[in-house]
Amino acid sequence: MNVKVENIEKNVVKLEITVDSEKFNEAVKKSFKKNAKRFNVPGFRKGKAPLNIIKKYYGEGVLFEDAINFCCEDTYPKAIEENNIKPVDYPQIDVVQIGEGKDFIYTAEVTTVPEVKLGEYKGVEVKKVSYEVEDEAVENELKSMQEKNARVSLKEEGEIEKGNIAIIDFKGYVDGKAFEGGEAKDYEIEIGSGTFIGDFEDQLVGLKKDESKEVNVSFPEEYGREDLNGKPATFEVTIKDIKVKELPALDDEFAKEVSEFDTLEELKSDIKDRMKKELSEKAKAEYEEAVVEAVGANAEIEIPKVMIEKEIENMVRDLEMRLKYQGLDLKSYYEFTNSSEEKVKEYMRETAEKRVKTDLIMQEIAKVEDIKATEEELKEKAMEVAKQYGQKDVEKTAELIANAQKAYLEIDIVNGKVLDLLVESSKEIA
């Protein structure tokens, strides 16, 4: 095998790879062995015609497609390894010379990992991030707990008031016609919750059980459905029942009922402690992100478009998986958000570019600092991931993960170590 390397443009190289005729003939024989059964030659049972007859009957090129694949699969990986080329995508293969008794020559054009010029990455100055737990936040959490533990009962007499729950039948019309999704029976709505569009809920205040009313509202301009965006609508509404919510008193008895604590003050203290922990984790994550951004601002990288496109595809696949868990698919997501595949991908582009840049910088720092993942760390990370799957045999699952996802585990561990280095060496400023 002979290899010539030519730099076509920044981050794009073309390899001209020559496979000697003997090796190519072996690939042709291998192709014949694979495809022999599909050839039908008069005078021979199907699949029994010898190689020389097949070539004569079908032409020598009939076996070239698989022969080319065999040659490329064997020589391309060796060529990029020997020439220290790190591709980021599949190569564009073009045949230069092919024929019986000739050397097989092909070119492979491929985009490579870009050069990363690191600036200062140790000791970057980053503004301190901190959060305080507000008393209002604690009170809001208590109110939420009150709501969850409210007693709901039928309101036998009287009108709908704010805070009541109305059980309604409704049917909506736009331009005088009923529209899809605009009808429901025995629908529960809390008055004042803002669940419905416009002042729909306010217009129900004062109605009694079994009364009906025509409610007029307008859909928001960006409601998410082209047939409804910004349009006025009329709803025929009938009150089936009215319920009233009775909130429990915020006292020691409430604390005992909803928690492990004996007093309301103990419950408040626990809520505050949990919020402090959450805000501390939030501050830590934001500080780490700011450190990485500062390091990124000091670096110079010209990211190939193909790397960004690949990351966008990964993000779309992740979105598709998350939607699947919710019983949805991409098509319904695009319809619900009044979007499209093109719009979503464009929205993801900035984040994708940021992710690619961060990964490249982390890899370069790891290389400069000689940061690697140890076998022990790989085992620990695999065990950590395995526990998340909830399998009975955690150790066996961890072993499978360590083998199947070793490269991903290594990247995760190394990136974590690099992040620790960057954060520990950073300077926190007020």
From Swiss-Prot:
Gene3D superfamilies linked: 3.10.50.40, Trigger factor ribosome-binding domain, Trigger factor, C-terminal domain
EC class: isomerase
Pfam families associated with the record: FKBP_C, Trigger_C, Trigger_N
Domain of life: Bacteria
Gene Ontology CC entries for this record: cytoplasm
UniProt domain PPIase FKBP-type: residue ranges: 163-248
Main subcellular location of this protein, as a coarse class: cytoplasm
Listed EC numbers: 5.2.1.8
Subcellular location: Cytoplasm
GO process annotations (BP): 'de novo' cotranslational protein folding; cell division; chaperone-mediated protein folding; protein transport; protein unfolding
UniProt GO MF annotations: peptidyl-prolyl cis-trans isomerase activity; protein folding chaperone; ribosome binding
Catalytic function, reaction form: [protein]-peptidylproline (omega=180) = [protein]-peptidylproline (omega=0)
Keywords linked to the UniProt accession: Cell cycle, Cell division, Chaperone, Cytoplasm, Isomerase, Rotamase
Domain comment as written in the entry: Consists of 3 domains; the N-terminus binds the ribosome, the middle domain has PPIase activity, while the C-terminus has intrinsic chaperone activity on its own.
Family: Belongs to the FKBP-type PPIase family. Tig subfamily.
Cited function: Involved in protein export. Acts as a chaperone by maintaining the newly synthesized protein in an open conformation. Functions as a peptidyl-prolyl cis-trans isomerase.
Protein name per the record: Trigger factor
Species name: Clostridium botulinum (strain Hall / ATCC 3502 / NCTC 13319 / Type A)
